[in-house]
Amino acid sequence: MDALYNAAKPRVVAIGGPTATGKTALSVALAKRFGGEIISADSMQIYQGLDVGTAKVTPEEMQGVPHHLVGFLAPEQAFSVADFTTLAGKTITQLTAQGKLPLVVGGTGLYITSLLNGIGFTPEKVDPAIRQELQARLQAEGSQALYAELAAVDPGYAAKVHPNNTPRVIRALELYRATGRKMSAEREAARPAEKPYRSLCLCLTCRDRTLLYQRIDTRCDRMMQSGILEEAKLVYNHRDTYRTAAQAIGYKEFFPYFEGTADLESCLAHLKQASRNYAKRQLTWFRRQTDAVWLYLEDGNLEQQAAEQTEAFLAENNA
């Protein structure tokens, strides 16, 4: 298979789509079949000790396939899309040099599209005073106040960001307050004339939205059985330092239970609803990727379909 990796541009297979669609299992099967390794494109699975609530791949699920960018960062540390594209790019270079197929797998669409499109990000030094001021305002006024400020100064970027995606809202406000530059303009300037990789993007979903929601509910129930409450309590107890995790779906839904303002059943119902809403946003993001190949769970035989797509992609001539 070495000849398949001699192109000037490395070949990369990405697997995306909403939560609870079987991306992990499919990626492991393809990695074993095509001699690949997996690069996680999940903004929460990077953290150490946060396994259940992030649906982090287990050693059993890995089946001996090496996984990169999983569980390597302390929860106190911030991690940006710039950090991801830098580390993932280095990993792709290393794997390609070894004759291995890089598979970029996860539900964080921004990570995948930024990497495959070669969007460059220049990490800026954050002024601690600006960040502290924004964090204080978040605590006092809530995420909607920060989002309203972003919509006022950079409506183009605000339209692409969910109001509850606080880390991205804060990052854009930090940039604007520190430099006067808009994140929307930074994004446009960062887009290269040519993509750095030859890529195949496979996206998994269900034709029937009800089936997807059932799978999400089942996953949430399994998380309860696997100890998500203990992880959520850990995050709650460290919410001032685990700032990213404290905003993540899977943990913040249980904070009212720890505060004595809601029962466990209602918190679990809230988690299921938040996860379904997140899946809708993931679908919206990935549907904008015009070159994505969609695979539907109802059709069955996903592994064979994905293998055929991958085989054809790898056999394409290098011109």
Feature locations, PLM:
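Phosphate/pyrophosphate-binding catalytic cores of soluble transferases and nucleic-acid-acting enzymes
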Residues: 1-319
